[in-house]
Design a protein with these regions (language model features):
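Bacterial Sec-pathway N-terminal export signals of envelope proteins
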Residues: 30-90, 286, 292-329, 409, ...
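Periplasmic alpha-helical coiled-coil/stalk elements that build and connect Gram-negative outer-membrane
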Residues: 3-9, 63-65, 192-313, 422, ...
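Transmembrane beta-barrel architecture of outer-membrane proteins
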Residues: 159-161, 207, 252, 345, ...
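Small/polar, glycine/serine/threonine/aspartate-rich low-complexity segments that form flexible
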Residues: 80-164, 295-304, 336, 349-379
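Amphipathic alpha-helical coiled-coil segments
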Residues: 53-68, 197, 203-220, 231, ...
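Small/polar (Gly/Ser/Thr/Ala-rich) solvent-exposed segments
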Residues: 52, 76-90, 147-157, 167-196, ...
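Bacterial Sec-dependent N-terminal signal peptides
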Residues: 1-38, 45, 497
Length: 497
């Protein structure tokens, strides 16, 4: 019964311990950040400042393209203004104003002179009646003249004007079409710049990632070699005590051990710097502790590929070539835009205008308006060949852009062939490094056996260890070189994604 009770207690305790371990497991995993190549790439793309700039340029050029499209549409503008002048516009001169102002006096005097002989024949009461009528008529004519004088007054010292104007381009010599194509090309340039920056970011993050992996494996190798040297030094010291080995052998081993410690320090420092660079590219704090998935595996996973140079694929995919082609297209459209300056331009205009004072019913001190519709034609006549010279300069820029495009194609063709050659060369080096590893390990095993048996010298054992270390280091370099050569080929072909 006690035995059964003890078993139950033991089982319960085991469950508690297991539960505690399971609870601690997430904390342990969370403390150690393991990054894969894909996760490093994703973080680098998210945090790269230049990619952010490229994205913003895409948005800018998309808005500029939309702006260019509006040039096909009618433009509506509202205008308004006020003007004060110290003098008003006068339709009549001073003499004419004086004549109208004294019109009654002049006419009355003329009538009185003309009718005087006849009036003198009338009786006195009749003469008085005629004189009274002439005076009244003179006053009426004076009033009429004054009204005519005032009617011709413009009163333009305070002028108001306003209106709404609509303009619709009909033919602009192809300038609007060229401007829209330029906007489309600029949008393509922004996209191709983004693709180029993205590929450069991936290329650099891959290099930094595999550099860390390479140095980590070399650090493990240096630690292993240092352990071997320490063990060998211990064995030699024991043999010296037994009188089998000399002090010179012991000193040689000590020097090798010190060299191994120095090598380990160098590779550890290099690894720390490489991790800092990788963290910076990923947007992480440079002092953050990270572990890469490929550095904790037994071996570096290498997949060899056989490639044939495909220049056409590179020409179709490389964003650098697309950017140069964009430059060619841009200069061609700029030439068309300049040529449009020498062609006639036709626009429809229309709108509604108001003025105060207005002249639609004489001069009235109030707002009056009217509708209008018209055609505006602009025909260049002579500009001293200014446009002609600009067109020639733009055509020269097109020639330069075509030459740069052809030169870039030749260089990319060479780059693709070099990258393909490097991939094949890296595969061969990897095969030779693997073969050297087998020979070096067998040589080391034989040397160790001979040393233990006493018929192999310390120098021979150290040479075997050094050869083994060199072979292991060459294998790491060969494996990493295969990885980097494949990345370089993808970048050369424009397929790095």
């Amino acid at each position: 019964m006690n035995t059964t009770k003890t078993k139950k207690q033991t089982t319960a305790m085991a469950r508690v311990v297991l539960l505690g371990l399971l609870m601690l497991l997430p904390m342990t995993v969370g403390a150690q950040r393991v990054l894969t190549l894909d996760s490093c790439r994703a973080m680098a793309l998210r945090n790269n400042k230049q990619i952010g700039v490229a994205k913003t340029k895409q948005e800018i050029n998309a808005n500029l393209r939309k702006s260019a499209r509006t040039k096909y549409l009618p433009q509506v503008n509202a205008l308004g203004g006020y003007t004060w002048t110290s003098k008003e516009i006068s339709i009549l001169n001073d003499e004419q104003k004086s004549i109208l102002g004294n019109l009654g006096v002049d006419v009355g005097g003329a009538l009185q002179n003309s009718l005087a002989p006849l009036v003198s024949l009338l009786p006195a009461p009749a003469q008085a009646k005629v004189a009274q009528d002439l005076t009244h008529l003179t006053g009426l004519i004076d009033q009429t003249g004054q009204k005519m004088k005032n009617a011709f007054r413009t009163d333009t010292r305070n002028m108001f004007a306003g209106g709404v104007v609509v303009t619709q381009p009909v033919y602009m010599g192809g300038a609007i079409t060229a401007a829209n194509k330029i906007a489309d090309i600029n949008e393509d340039i922004a996209q191709n710049s983004f693709d180029a920056q993205r590929q450069n970011t991936l290329y650099h993050i891959d290099q930094a990632y595999w550099q860390v992996v390479s140095l980590r494996y070399k650090q493990k190798l240096a630690e292993s070699f240092l352990d071997l040297m320490k063990k060998l030094n211990s064995d030699v010291q024991r043999l010296i005590e037994e009188g089998v080995a000399t002090k010179g052998d012991g000193l040689s081993i000590s020097v090798k051990e010190n060299d191994a410690e120095i090598a380990l320090t160098k590779v550890s420092d290099g690894l720390a710097l490489a991790r800092m660079l990788l963290c910076q590219l990923c947007g992480l704090p440079i002092d953050e502790t990270i572990t890469l998935a490929d550095e904790v595996s037994e071996d570096i996973a290498v997949q060899e590929i056989t490639v044939q140079p495909d220049v056409q694929q590179a020409v179709a995919n490389r964003p650098e070539l697309k950017l140069l082609q964009n430059t060619v297209d841009l200069t061609q459209q700029t030439t068309k835009e300049l040529k449009a300056l020498n062609l006639p331009q036709v626009m429809l205009t229309g709108g509604y205008a108001v003025t105060n004072p207005n002249t639609f019913n004489g001069f009235e001190k109030k707002f009056g308006g009217f509708w209008n519709l018209g055609v505006l034609v602009r025909v260049p006549v002579w500009n001293w060949n200014d446009t002609k010279y600009k067109v020639r300069a733009s055509q020269g820029a097109t020639t330069i852009a075509n030459l740069e495009l052809a030169d870039a194609r030749e260089k990319i063709e060479l780059q693709v062939n070099q990258s393909s050659f490097r991939v094949n060369e890296a595969n061969k080096k990897l095969a030779m490094a693997k073969a050297n590893i087998a020979h070096a390990e067998e040589n080391l095993r034989t040397a160790n056996i001979g040393f233990r048996e006493g018929f192999v010298s310390t120098t021979t054992v150290m040479e075997a260890h050094t050869t083994w270390l060199s072979a292991q280091s060459q294998l790491i370099d060969a494996e990493i070189d295969v990885k980097l050569s494949q990345v370089e080929l993808q970048k050369a072909l424009g397929t790095l994604e």
